């Protein structure tokens, strides 16, 4: 191993989102994992974090990831099984609302990223995270601003996290009808705010968020009950 490790990475022109990953693989730092989260700003439902390792070669079947910022729901659903099929490894972690309340969003997010990387069946040589540094990883890592539009492995992780969470929120609507979880996915919208005012928060809401906390302080009734209709394993981890 050279005295200076990891070695300086030289970026050369490559195809689509693979430039950064290709440079890391060329310098012997693969496999490269991307990690991203969904649900950070929602006031209900879990925080979902995914880690994904793609191979060093560009796959035509995943070419749509080059434009991940513009992906609609149908395209994400189409890519979801393709990513799971061709990824060298992936792992999805679900952090429930009560843990988000207890830890705080940022700390829960960092912990989720650590768990997602630790759960990979292939140990990465390097980790690319979307937006901010993930301390405590046992391998080199790099935060990438706008990572889901800059690195294919982060874009793939973003799709895995988004589809997994959206499906869970649809199931949550069946358990807690009236809130519109299937539509707004737990984010604050006028319809969600109106439902909260009428029904009060349920067990899936984040009581540390001010719009929910205000209702609790005002004495709005709370609806208990947990999610029961999710796919097996979706309340914890998938990988």
From Swiss-Prot:
EC numbers listed for it are 3.1.26.4
Mainly resides where? cytoplasm
Query: How many and how are cofactors bound here?
Result: Manganese or magnesium. Binds 1 divalent metal ion per monomer in the absence of substrate. May bind a second metal ion after substrate binding.
| Record domain RNase H type-2: where | 30-221
Reaction equation(s) it catalyzes: Endonucleolytic cleavage to 5'-phosphomonoester
**Could you tell me which Gene3D superfamilies the record lists for this protein?**
Ribonuclease H-like superfamily/Ribonuclease H
Keyword list (alphabetical) reads:
Cytoplasm, Endonuclease, Hydrolase, Manganese, Metal-binding, Nuclease
Entry's localization field:
Cytoplasm
Q: What's the protein here called? A: Ribonuclease HII
- Please name the source species: Mycobacterium sp. (strain KMS)
The lineage, from the top, is: Bacteria, Bacillati, Actinomycetota, Actinomycetes, Mycobacteriales
